[in-house]
From Swiss-Prot:
It is an enzyme of class 1 (oxidoreductase). InterPro entries: FAD-bd (IPR002938), FAD/NAD-bd_sf (IPR036188), FAD_mOase_fung (IPR050562). Keywords: FAD, Flavoprotein, Membrane, Monooxygenase, Oxidoreductase, Transmembrane, Transmembrane helix. FAD-dependent monooxygenase; part of the ATM1 gene cluster that mediates the biosynthesis of aflatrem, a tremorgenic mycotoxin with acute neurotoxic effects. Synthesis of geranylgeranyl diphosphate (GGPP) by AtmG (a GGPP synthase) precedes condensation of GGPP with indole 3-glycerol phosphate, followed by epoxidation and cyclization by AtmM (a FAD-dependent monooxygenase) and AtmC (a prenyltransferase) to produce paspaline. AtmB is also essential for paspaline production, but its exact role has not been identified yet. FAD binds at E36, G50, R109, D309, A322. This is FAD-dependent monooxygenase atmM. It is found in: Membrane. GO terms for cellular component: membrane. Induction: The onset of expression correlates with the onset of aflatrem biosynthesis in stationary cultures. Expression is induced by the developmental and secondary metabolism regulator veA. Belongs to the paxM FAD-dependent monooxygenase family. The chain crosses the membrane at residues 10-30, 445-465. It is a multi-pass membrane protein. Its cofactor is FAD. The gene is atmM.
Length: 479
């Protein structure tokens, strides 16, 4: 079969979503290219990345998890602190590891991207300095055009270009042309910004033990520190803004804003005598950004589809942003592999491809929306946003000792895997025990607690019970 007759994917964006998709497609034998606007595939911008079992298992299928594990130290204990000096410890990270056979672990985002691109077997498929400006639609294919005038032809364009996605905008234009009104003005302005984050990486700090995590809850602000391999501290300062912004008319931050935010909280305590000031003094890199929140309703149009942050964006509190992007790449590849392996990897008819993309959104939307809603609630719970959430965080959460591990387990257990690759030998009982079909009704005391919580907040507009609370309070897994 001639190359021109083979189905080809153009991936726009060479970060977590795009490079993971490239690995998946490579293993599936599906032709593809990656177009990345920057010259460096793994820049150091001060960010870290958390790999949770649902992402870790997929990376293991791709033969990448061993490299990740060598650069990380598994989390085992989380300490939660409050402004009144109260604190408690919870071993939910260790419990999650034991249940699923994979740890919760953090590393430099730069190092993770290095793993993805240096282990990719065919570098000629990855093109840097390719800033995509627009897409031309033809009856039989799509043409992607870059700022330098280069043209790339393919059958499916995948937008993996992040929250400021050019491909999402091009997809909207195409949808408006083919089906006027399909993407409403409301959807185009549905991404909001209510929080900002200063994130960074610091050298080891005395008192911050390797493998531990600290969540310091304050009014309108949360400090999260994760103590990784060799004592390196990955940290986030997440604060509520005075105003809500609507994307793209959002707020931008300078290095001076980051300094001002952090220097105002240097006296905030963490654990074992360490303060945030010690973390700040030992910083290596830092940056500040707005935290966009949204899950869009339109994920595809014609021969364009978006994955990862380009179509669903959540705060870092839940640690699932990168992992859901890895899942997106997995599900899209599974669907393509199922179709193409049956026709010899020939081009798909337009209607056949549209059906595939409908199936992709259908499979992903419900799961991602649940994780997104959980993330929305957690960022506000952590920041003690309002009296009800303040009371929940302070007087109820500390006494529901199994809740963090149970919530994490529910979001992990039903995650997808690469269907055409064998499952890894390492595993744990949690994949089966915490899947939806294995859950049974909760114990009565949990239902009583739910009644108390709801009764307290019945007349408060601030109380919105998220999906993970409602599910965890009315169902529990068979152990």
């Amino acid at each position: 079969m001639c190359d021109k007759d083979r189905f080809k994917v153009i991936i726009v964006g060479g970060s977590v979503a795009g490079l993971t998709l490239a690995h998946c497609l490579q293993r599936a034998g599906i032709d593809h290219v990656v177009l990345e606007k920057n010259s460096d595939l793994s820049p150091q911008v001060g960010a870290s990345i958390g790999i949770i079992p649902n992402g870790g298992r997929i990376l293991d299928q791709l033969g990448l998890f061993d490299a990740v594990e060598r650069m990380t130290y598994p989390l085992s204990i989380a300490t939660i602190t409050y402004p009144d000096g109260y604190s408690f410890r919870n071993n939910y990270p260790k419990t999650v590891d034991e249940r699923f056979g994979y740890p919760i672990a953090f590393l430099d985002r730069q190092k993770f991207l290095e793993i993805l691109h240096t282990s990719y077997p065919d570098p000629s498929n990855i093109h840097t300095n390719c800033r995509v400006t627009h897409i031309r639609r033809h009856d039989s294919h799509m043409e992607v055009v870059t700022s330098s005038g280069q043209e790339y032809t393919g059958d499916l364009v995948v937008g993996a270009d992040g929250v400021h996605s050019v491909i999402r905008s091009e997809m909207w234009k195409l949808a408006d042309a083919l089906e006027p009104g399909r993407v409403s003005k409301r959807e185009k302005r549905s991404m909001k910004v209510e929080y900002a984050c200063v994130f960074g990486i610091s050298l080891p700090v005395p008192g911050l033990k390797v493998g531990d995590q600290v969540n310091a809850f304050h009014d309108g602000l949360t400090i999260i520190t994760i103590h990784g391999k060799n004592g390196r501290v990955f940290w986030f300062v997440i604060k509520k803004l005075d105003d809500m912004y609507t994307y793209p008319d959002t707020v931008r931050f300078s290095s001076a804003d980051a300094v001002r935010t952090c220097e105002n909280i240097v006296h905030f305590p963490l654990v074992n005598g360490a303060t945030f000031g010690h973390v700040w003094e030992n910083r290596e890199v830092t940056s500040m950004t707005a935290l966009e929140e949204n899950i869009f309703n339109t994920w595809y149009a014609d021969r364009i589809v978006c994955i990862g942050d380009s179509i669903h964006k959540m705060t870092p509190n839940i640690g699932q942003g990168a992992n859901t992007a890895i899942e997106d790449a997995t599900v899209l590849t599974n669907l393509l592999y199922d179709r193409l392996s049956k026709n010899g990897h020939k081009k798909l008819a337009r209607q056949e491809l549209l059906q595939l993309l409908r199936e992709f959104q259908s499979q992903r939307f419900r799961r991602v929306n649940k994780i997104y809603q959980d993330s929305r609630f957690l960022v506000r719970l952590h920041a003690r946003d309002g009296i009800v959430k303040s009371l929940l965080a302070r007087y109820i959460v500390p006494y529901m000792t199994e809740l963090p591990a149970d919530l994490a387990s529910k979001s992990i257990a039903d995650s997808p895997t690469i269907g055409f690759l064998p499952l890894p030998s390492r595993s744990g009982p949690g994949w089966l025990q915490w899947s939806r079909k294995q859950r049974r009704p909760a114990t009565p005391w949990i239902l009583v607690l739910l009644v108390i919580v709801v009764s307290f907040g019945l007349h408060s507009p601030e109380l919105v019970i998220p999906t993970f609370w409602s599910n965890s309070l009315v169902s529990k897994t068979v152990e």
